[in-house]
UniProtKB/Swiss-Prot annotation:
It comes from the Eukaryota. This is Dihydrofolate reductase. InterPro entries: DHFR (IPR012259), DHFR-like_dom_sf (IPR024072), DHFR_dom (IPR001796). Keywords: NADP, One-carbon metabolism, Oxidoreductase. Key enzyme in folate metabolism. Catalyzes an essential reaction for de novo glycine and purine synthesis, and for DNA precursor synthesis. One of its GO terms (molecular function) is dihydrofolate reductase activity. The keyword Oxidoreductase applies. The gene is DHFR-1. SUPFAM superfamilies: Dihydrofolate reductase-like. NADP(+) binds at residues 7, 13-19, 62-64, 84-86, 118-125. Substrate binds at residues 29-34, 78. Residues 1-201 form the DHFR domain. Transmembrane segments: none annotated.
């Protein structure tokens, strides 16, 4: 199954000038992405749990790949898949493909998850593919200047679930203690507040 992972502003902006639109990276959100993308989500009516997995894939566009500092590429403990029109050589843990459909030809274990992590065009391809999917969204309560926005979708066709409390339990405890407020079930870093949500279609439950 596909899972889209995105951090977006109140107006659905996801980027500005080839960078995230918030002044500083959000440590708790980054920790959640790292933990989630190395796990299989176990979703029950009352909680979210994670089962570790070293065979998941992260799918991204070439600009997203290039935006990752070289010392962190490829993303560890995950199969990295980069959609790129230009020529590039695949390696043991990184595959360069030219179409979204080429995912089906990659040696991904059937039990693995495929996490789509941006940018906008890759999100669009995932949504247009018709594949069952989840959306893990970190929603930032700000509307900063953005020049890239998440694709338009009918959000009302998804069931929205606040998983912020679950995330506070699943990420590094030091980060949770520093940035999570149990009273409001909200993370706040450097004056920026945000929550995590899971969007599901009824047919993917």
């Amino acid at each position: 199954m596909l899972a889209l992972v995105v951090a977006l502003a109140s107006h659905r902006g996801i980027g500005n000038a080839n960078a995230l639109p918030w002044p500083r990276p959000l440590a708790a959100d980054m920790a959640w992405f790292r933990t989630l993308s190395q796990s299989i989500p176990l979703i029950s009516p009352d909680r979210i749990a994670l089962a570790p997995s070293a065979s998941n894939a992260v799918v991204m566009g070439r600009r997203t790949w290039d935006s990752i500092p070289s010392r962190f590429r490829p993303l560890a403990n995950r199969i990295n898949v980069v959609l790129s029109r230009g020529p590039a050589r695949s390696t043991e843990n990184t595959f360069f493909i030219q179409t979204f459909e080429a995912l089906d030809s990659l040696p991904l274990p059937p039990s693995s998850m495929t996490f789509v992590i941006g940018g906008r065009d890759v999100y669009s391809l995932a949504l247009e593919s018709g594949r069952p999917h989840l959306i893990f969204a970190t929603e930032v309560f700000e509307s900063p200047e953005c020049d890239v926005f998440f694709p338009h979708i009918d959000w009302a066709s998804y069931e929205k679930r606040d998983i912020t409390r679950d995330v506070s339990r699943l990420i590094d405890r030091t980060l949770a203690s520093a940035f999570y407020s149990p009273e409001t079930a909200t993370f706040t870093e450097n004056g920026t507040s945000f929550k995590m949500f899971l969007y599901t279609k009824p047919e993917t439950r």
